[in-house]
Amino acid sequence: MNLSQIYNKSPSFISIWKITWPIIIANLTLPIVTATDTAVMGREQSSTFIAAIALGGIVFNIIYFSLNFLRMSTTGLVSQEKGRKNEEEIKKIIRLTLSIAIAIGFLIICSSYPLIEIAKILISGSEQAEHLMSEYIFYRSFASPATLMNMVFLGVFIGIGYAKFAMFQLVSISILNAILSIV
């Protein structure tokens, strides 16, 4: 096989760009949630609320970053099976990764108190900020199953080539979260 044959079989810049631009746009919306939470807490009398959101946010950023393998592995496995045109295997992958996401999500909920104690040891703030951080971690842990399931769905959509739907999903969730934080 010569170079021109390889070039003709490789995806074009345009076909790659069609997949990547929605993902780029979607990821640009993610800071909206933090900015909204900060703005809402900034209206409170004390800066302690902003500190608590920041400290608790660090905890969940680390957790979710560590679990990003759910999206990445789902994307890779689903795209391979899509290339093989194996819908049954795609369904199995979705069931398996959703089961893993739900199990880990409930594990995070059940571990919220030890997680809070570890966070207090590793992240220091004022006594009031740590108390509010504890509440934030406790309540936000209940969103873990849905957050992790969302990672799986994003992986599926990207894996089957529906990057625009993944973008719509992330943008919608970010906007909805911002609206609900304000209300």
Task: Identify the residue ranges that each predicted region occupies.
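Residue-level recognition of pore/gate-forming positions within transmembrane alpha-helices
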Residues: 23, 31, 58, 96, ...
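Hydrophobic/aromatic residues within transmembrane alpha-helices of membrane transport systems
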Residues: 25, 37-41, 53, 78-83, ...
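Interfacial/gating helices of multi-pass transporter permease domains
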Residues: 41-61, 127-135
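Small-residue-rich hydrophobic transmembrane alpha-helices
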Residues: 50-110, 147-161, 165-166
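Short alpha-helical transmembrane segments in multi-pass integral membrane proteins
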Residues: 1-20, 78-145, 183
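Alpha-helical transmembrane segments of multipass membrane proteins
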Residues: 35-39, 118, 152-156, 178-183
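Residue-level signal for short hydrophobic patches within transmembrane helices
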Residues: 13-32, 36, 59-66, 142, ...
